[in-house]
């Protein structure tokens, strides 16, 4: 690997070992003689493969040192003193010692623990650290003896102060690495680990250390850190765990054939197939498959946000979110996207983001084949098929598939509107609604159609618009074979056939097929007219009414007839006009068979059969079939004459009377 300019290249692990071999072996070899050390700067220059090689070499050297006097059935003697802890290794039973290895000298540098053994993470917890890391300083140790000597400077307690025999020597070295290669478990003391590893296979503890050393290189287990790294601080956990771990074996799920290194991980996984949820919330009776999920869920009820940012006074439920947020303030390591230069605090977030550019969607739904960029998105999507709605509102009982939907829904009950527009002061319950609203002020339309260049403020509007170009209408009605571009429009249409009107007005009892129609109808009772014309101040109950009205001021007539060139301000007016050319009369009276080009004409006609006169004068009580007739009649009471002759100034209450009067001036004869 080429060295960066101005920095020295680290020595190769193999070359360092070769140099060690030249030393005088007659003086006796210690582990320190074959140990290889790197500084922090040198360690950072090594790539991943070189770091793995380093660990291989260190383990190989250790195997050579211990094999000189250690094998199955041999006796070992330990000599311990207050000044140092050492081991004498005999070549055979009864022979004199050939070498002395000082455990206090044998240690692995900090970068190794951090990079090669990522699960340890150099955590600083209690003085009795289950991964043999000093709790007060950041120095790392490979053996328990090193840790005890180091802790004497900071802590008077020595939880397992005893003579260190050869098995402890072997187990202590193995602890950091080997427990990640087998089942992934960690235990508070070396003896616990040795007992744990021996029990599943039926062998006695301390019976064979050479087999454990060989496990480093067997079946490439070195590269398998373990799938379930459980940290146990009590011996009873070891006893429980002994019955579920297999040395070198895998536990396979009979449903999906996924394999696990530990049986309790398999048991936990199988709850996905069985649907079993052992941990139940005492507040809402919702159950979970994992205890950690229950603990996180309970925070929803308490409203607790234990992780608070001191700079911005923002609080978080999860520690990971808090750490992620803090990186924005501290300006920590940022991972940059090569395509758009966007930066991220975590490399995993960058990898997920890059799928936007590559189009990769590695997570596919087994039910419908839909794929996603993130596993969490797939997990949420699968609830559509299962019908699971785990997040329930304690006020009204309504349930949701996603927790943020529940949080947003709760604001309906509390009336909370935490997101306020800085331009107009309008507030919103959701941040996404505020962002969309702010585009009205900024004029931003970030979603542009590639076909025609038309842009939109909302992504949903762009998707709806695209169907105009593609002509894609995948949702077809089974009754009339009419097709639609969106599923919810089909559902609304099907209510025409079923007669279903699920949205009912609480004031007058009138029901509607669409919720939007009910909202618009309610404005009749409340008198709300939220859409106001900036030109004349006239207001409307519907946005479409305002758009159509504005065309009176602008003179815009965007809808043109292809037959005669006549243009209209409304699409409905064009459709009605085109029936003049086609002769189409789709609205037929069931009583007499007469047909009409407009539905309003049919409704008015049917009142002739039924005798219905729904429009009544408030002054005299006279009823009328048509609303226009009522308006004309009311002018008798008000004296209003809106139609004035431009020639003589005479005015009339009806337009037809004005037309007839004009013929007096023009001398036109009908």
From Swiss-Prot:
A zinc finger (C2H2-type) spans 251-273, 279-301, 335-357, 363-385, 391-413, 419-441, 447-469, 475-497, 503-525, 531-553, 559-581, 587-609, 615-637, 643-665. It comes from Homo sapiens (Human). One of its GO terms (biological process) is regulation of transcription by RNA polymerase II. One of its GO terms (cellular component) is nucleus. Keywords: DNA-binding, Isopeptide bond, Metal-binding, Nucleus, Phosphoprotein, Repeat, Transcription, Transcription regulation, Ubl conjugation, Zinc, Zinc-finger. It is found in: Nucleus. GO terms for molecular function: DNA-binding transcription factor activity, RNA polymerase II-specific; RNA polymerase II cis-regulatory region sequence-specific DNA binding; zinc ion binding. Its main location: nucleus. There is a cross-link at residue 319 (Glycyl lysine isopeptide (Lys-Gly) (interchain with G-Cter in SUMO2)). Signal peptide: none annotated. The modification Phosphoserine is found at residue 126. Residues 29-100 form the KRAB domain. SUPFAM superfamilies: beta-beta-alpha zinc fingers, KRAB domain (Kruppel-associated box). InterPro entries: KRAB, KRAB_dom_sf, Zinc_finger, Znf_C2H2_sf, Znf_C2H2_type. May be involved in transcriptional regulation. This is Zinc finger protein 551. Belongs to the krueppel C2H2-type zinc-finger protein family.
